[in-house]
Regions:
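Mid-chain, well-packed structural core segment of small domains
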Residues: 61-92
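Domain-level recognition of nuclease-like catalytic cores that cleave nucleotide substrates
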Residues: 86-122
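Short acidic/glycine-enriched loop/turn segments that link adjacent beta-strands
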Residues: 33-36, 105
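Conserved catalytic cores of phosphodiester-cleaving nucleases, focusing on short active-site segments
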Residues: 19, 38-61, 68, 76
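Acidic-basic catalytic patches of nuclease active cores, encompassing PD-(D/E)XK
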Residues: 1-29
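Acidic active-site catalytic centers that drive phospho-/nucleotidyl reactions
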Residues: 12, 37-39, 52, 72, ...
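Short, glycine/acidic-enriched loop or turn micro-motifs at the edges of active sites
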Residues: 31-33, 55, 99
């Protein structure tokens, strides 16, 4: 596995542990529909959270959140629409971003709740 893929997997693993420690139930990881993917779908307090995970080894360059641009957000929303229909979801759905900076399983984690919403794009 390429180094950046290993870092991404370690970041997603750390994000899942973080979410579980905060009382979230993980419904799916890396859920795919056609060419779209949702990193993490979690549930807590009657809400579904679609969470995009961005991991970097350092913050010398672009901040991880900057990698979730308009085009990426549109793909996440389209994948979420498919997810909602496929699983017949009735609960409210929110879009979060978790950014991780670090390596070797040691990360600074930031959970940005309600990072974006559908109203901004339609």
């Amino acid at each position: 596995m390429a180094k950046h893929n290993e870092l991404g997997k370690a970041g997603e693993d750390a994000a899942v542990k973080y979410l579980e420690s905060k009382g979230y139930t993980i419904r799916h990881r890396n859920w795919r529909f056609m060419h779209w993917e949702l990193d993490i779908v979690a549930y807590k307090d009657g809400e579904v959270r679609v969470i995009e995970v961005k991991t970097r080894s350092n913050d010398d360059f672009k901040e991880p959140i900057e990698a979730v641009n308009h085009q990426k957000r549109m793909r996440i929303m389209k994948a979420t629409d498919a997810y909602i229909k496929y699983f017949n979801i009735d609960e409210p759905v929110f879009f979060d971003i978790i950014t991780l900076v670090g390596s070797d399983g040691i990360f600074d984690i930031e959970h940005i709740k309600n990072a974006f919403n559908i109203r901004h794009y339609y």
